[in-house]
Design a protein with these regions (language model features):
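Phosphate-binding and adjacent anionic-ligand microenvironments
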Residues: 170-171, 179, 316, 320-322, ...
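Gly/Ser/Thr-enriched, mixed-charge loops and adjacent short helices
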Residues: 16, 20-27, 46-55, 165-309, ...
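An N-terminal, well-structured beta->alpha segment
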Residues: 3-4, 13-116, 232-257, 265
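N-terminal small/polar loop signature for handling phosphorylated ligands or for N-terminal nucleophile
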Residues: 100-179, 273-335
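Conserved phosphate/anionic-ligand binding catalytic regions in large, soluble enzymes, centered on
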Residues: 51-71, 156-157, 177, 261-269, ...
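Short acidic, glycine/serine/threonine-rich loops at helix termini
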Residues: 110-115, 140-144, 162-190, 220-223, ...
Length: 589
């Protein structure tokens, strides 16, 4: 966003009202303007807040709270963005460019998608609009499958409130603010190579933003009432088949999977894909059907949110072998496995643990040809590099976000610790919770046929490469300037001297460009890496979307062949607790 300007320009407010096609936001502004003119200080403050910033497109597309005005997500902002995207594509390709457009099940997303389709059509493009809500991986699949030049996903979801509390820390997240998004992917003739079909990165985001800024009055934006093409069940069916094929095989032994769809768009597709490979799927009924009023689930913290509790209860009831949950947009996937050492009998796997077993499976498959690259974000576990090396494959680091991971040349598998996995980059250049769920479940069935389990595989890898245990620390603040100040202190000599009793022997600033693992450098990023003599590591970076400072902690504990891994796991947990305590003291947030 642009820097806030708290002065109130009533002429600009009136002009916005005049061109707003949405009666709800138009009346919202009109009522505030009338109250302002009558001396209502609260209305004046609300108007000033709505018009103090301009929501701008970045590498994440458009993201903002819904509401009226240029600083919120609404139909006016999206129409302008669509016009800018159309101008960008027209400048690159001429007329006839193709854009796939999808939306989620939340209220208002369909209107944003239809406006986008109308603008693309009016600009001489070919708009392909999903006829119903769809999961994000289906949109990313359609972009590559149909050879389109771009794709847009319109969503309205929930995010933590601005009062300093966090939805991910609550069992019920209904108090969260909305956060709408308008995500942009490029492919077809615009982007070639490994980035074809991935989300935008620089310089594309800035080039599109320039054209959005040049859009004048909406009166000059042609918006026909028809002319776009509908995408129906056939594309969804193709994606479902593709997700099933991503497993490379059918279930090898009977396996019962409990599936939690978190009231999002991916439940039916994920259930069908799992069934097609011969798995017995039991869905969590209260979380299965899409709910336009449901708050989003912070799936990357299921153990805190309590959202997995119904699935775990059902798993105990039906004697399941595996629990899988996919995020509301089906981009992320988390899992739980039976474990007698855990209270309740079920162990929730971390994103790094799922990434480890999926990475081992991908490496075994790729080793037959001797080619392929495994990649993960720089904040994720270093275990994947060791797996790749053990199989004679390459490994790459990437900045956080799948827009970077999916651009790795030769990629056969990529993941980030926040429960995102790309298991079939030839089909979907984004995180794909459905394909990951299918591959993980089939792997569990193969292991079951061999008399083993996912837990056994994790233990084997720990003995081969050391137990790599990871845990995050997120510090939320009300004043974002506190995060900048904390990073400045760390860079100015305030780095910890030791972590968990081990001296810090290396400090690396990601602004200098970290190694990609192949002799190259990653783009500069705001973050710091601390390594200790014990080979523990912490990555500290500001969140890109929330007022948080995030710390990604990893410890490595050697495991002798004759030693129980559970002992090493307890040692690692104690060390992670000590590291988090040390970080809290150093950061002072």
């Amino acid at each position: 966003m642009t820097p806030p300007d708290r002065s109130l320009d009533t002429v600009a407010v009136t002009a916005w009202i005049d061109e707003d096609p949405d009666p709800t936001t138009r009346e919202e502004l009109a009522a505030l303007l009338r109250a302002h003119e009558n001396g209502d200080a609260e209305a004046t403050a609300a108007l000033a807040d709505a018009f103090s910033t301009i929501l701008r497109l970045g590498a994440a597309g458009l993201r903002g709270r819904p509401g009226a005005g240029p600083g919120r997500m609404n139909r006016v902002v999206v129409i302008r963005a669509a016009a800018g995207l159309a101008a960008y594509l027209r400048d690159k390709l001429g007329a006839g460019f193709a854009v796939v457009i999808g939306y989620d099940a939340h209220h208002g997303s369909d209107a944003l998608a239809r406006d986008t389709a109308s603008v693309i059509t009016g600009a001489g493009g070919r708009a392909l609009l999903f006829e119903s809500h769809c999961p994000t991986p289906v949109l990313a699949f359609a972009l590559r499958r149909l050879g389109a030049d771009a794709a847009v996903m319109a969503t309205t979801s929930r995010r933590p409130p601005r009062d300093g509390g966090g939805c991910e820390d609550r069992a019920d997240a209904n108090g969260c603010d909305d956060l709408s998004s308008w995500a942009v992917y490029l492919g077809g003739r615009v982007v070639t190579g490994p980035g074809r079909g991935a989300r935008i990165v620089p310089p594309h985001d800035a080039e599109i933003a320039e054209r959005i800024a040049a859009v004048g009055s909406l009166d000059g934006v042609p918006m026909p009432d028809s002319g776009w093409e509908g995408l129906g069940a056939e594309v969804v069916e193709e994606y479902t088949d593709s997700a099933a094929r991503a497993a490379r095989m059918r279930a090898a032994a009977p396996l019962r999977v409990v599936l939690a769809a978190m009231r999002g768009e991916g439940g039916r597709i994920c259930r069908d894909a799992l069934s097609r490979v011969g798995l017995d799927v039991v869905v969590v009924p209260e979380q299965f059907d899409p709910d336009p009023d449901s708050p989003a689930v912070v799936l990357s913290a299921p153990e805190e949110s309590g959202r997995l509790d119904p699935a775990l209860a059902l798993a105990r009831q039906v004697d399941a072998d595996l629990v899988i949950a996919i995020g509301p947009d089906a981009g992320r996937c988390c899992a739980a496995i039976p474990d007698k050492h855990v209270t309740g009998g079920w162990r929730r796997l971390t994103g790094d643990e799922v990434g480890t077993v999926l990475g081992e499976q991908a490496a075994e498959l790729a080793a037959f040809t001797g080619t392929g690259i495994l990649a993960n974000s720089i904040v994720s576990s270093r275990m994947l590099r060791k797996i790749a090396q053990a199989h004679g494959l390459g490994h790459r680091n990437a900045l956080t976000g799948f827009k970077w991971i999916c651009r790795v040349p030769g990629l056969v598998f990529g993941y980030e610790e926040a429960l995102g996995y790309c298991v079939d980059p030839a089909a979907v250049r984004d995180k794909d919770g459905i394909s990951a769920a299918v591959r993980l479940a089939v792997l569990a069935s193969v292991l079951k046929q061999q008399g083993r389990s996912i837990a056994d595989l994790l233990d084997r890898l720990a003995r081969e490469h050391g137990l790599h245990a990871t845990s995050p620390l997120s510090l939320r603040v009300e004043d974002p300037s506190l995060i900048s100040a904390a990073m400045e202190r760390l860079r100015a000599g305030g780095a910890p001297a030791s972590l968990a009793g081990s001296p810090v022997v290396d400090v690396f600033d990601l602004m200098d460009g970290a190694s990609d693992g192949n002799g190259g450098r990653l783009p500069p990023a705001d973050g710091l890496i601390f390594k200790t003599a014990a080979d523990d590591r912490v990555v500290v970076r500001p969140s890109g979307t929330e007022p948080k400072l995030k710390c990604y902690c990893e410890v490595v504990v050697p495991v002798a062949v004759e030693d129980p891994v559970e002992v090493a796991r307890r040692t690692a947990a104690d060390r992670l607790d000590a590291i988090r305590a040390d970080l809290r003291g150093v950061l002072g947030l």
